[in-house]
Structures are given as C-alpha cells and as structure tokens.
C-alpha cells in the first residue's frame, strides 16, 4: 500500500525452461495467488495489479514464453482493480503490440520501457 493505494505485484512469466527461476506454470501461479488470499481479504482487494507477464488473452502472444496467465484474468474478474499493468511483451515483437486495452472495466497498460498513469484514473 502506498498513500492509500493498494498495489499487488506478481513477478514471473510462463514456464518455458523447466526449473528456470521466475518462470511458473499456470498451476504454480494459481498457488502463489492462493497464498495471498488472507492479505487480499484483509485489505479488501487491491487497486492496481502489477505483473511481469500479461494475462491470458489480454495483450499476450501465442508463443509459450509470452503467453499470459489465466490466474491474472481470474484476479481481475474477482477484484476489479482500476489498473492492470504488465510488461514482458515488447513493442518490437510485432504489429499486435497494444499499449492500452481494457479487461472488463479494468484499464490494461503494457508498460514496455515505461508508462506514466494518473491515479485515480481520469474518466
């Protein structure tokens, strides 16, 4: 939490080299999130979700290293944060790069290199 803004951060990407550091299976990521249940309940959720990898189907790519996590979609659906900020998918990876998107009412930002947001979000 920073100045009353509840921020949840989750590092790592989809596992594409077994045993590599900071790479997780979908099941692993769900387990990491389950460990946060008590904190999320106590804080009544979060306002901003910051991750390294994208969410599945939201600014991700088809190749395994750049696929997103369904676990992040589930988190966003449950807690409806104002922002979901991720990286890992770079602008030079192709024409499918999207800097901004939405998932439900959550604003999605690909923070490749850097990105500045206003909080609370301007309408």
What are the residue ranges of the model-derived segments?
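Conserved catalytic scaffold of divalent metal-dependent phosphoesterases
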Residues: 1-67, 71
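Binuclear metal-dependent phosphoesterase catalytic core
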Residues: 2-3, 74-83, 90-123
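Residue-level signal for functionally critical sites in structured catalytic/ligand-binding pockets
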Residues: 16-19, 86, 110
């Amino acid at each position: 939490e920073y100045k009353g803004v509840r921020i949840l951060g989750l590092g790592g990407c989809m596992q594409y080299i077994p045993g590599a550091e900071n790479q997780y299976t979908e099941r692993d990521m769900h387990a990491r999130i389950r460990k946060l249940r008590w904190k999320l309940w106590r804080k009544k959720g979060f306002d901003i979700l910051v991750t390294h990898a994208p969410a599945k189907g939201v600014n991700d790519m088809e190749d395994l290293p750049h696929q997103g996590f369904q676990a992040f979609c589930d988190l966003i659906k449950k807690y409806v944060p104002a922002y979901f900020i991720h990286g890992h998918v770079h602008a030079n990876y192709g024409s499918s790069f999207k800097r901004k998107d939405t998932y439900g009412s959550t604003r999605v930002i690909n923070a490749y290199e850097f990105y500045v947001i206003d909080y609370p979000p301007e309408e």
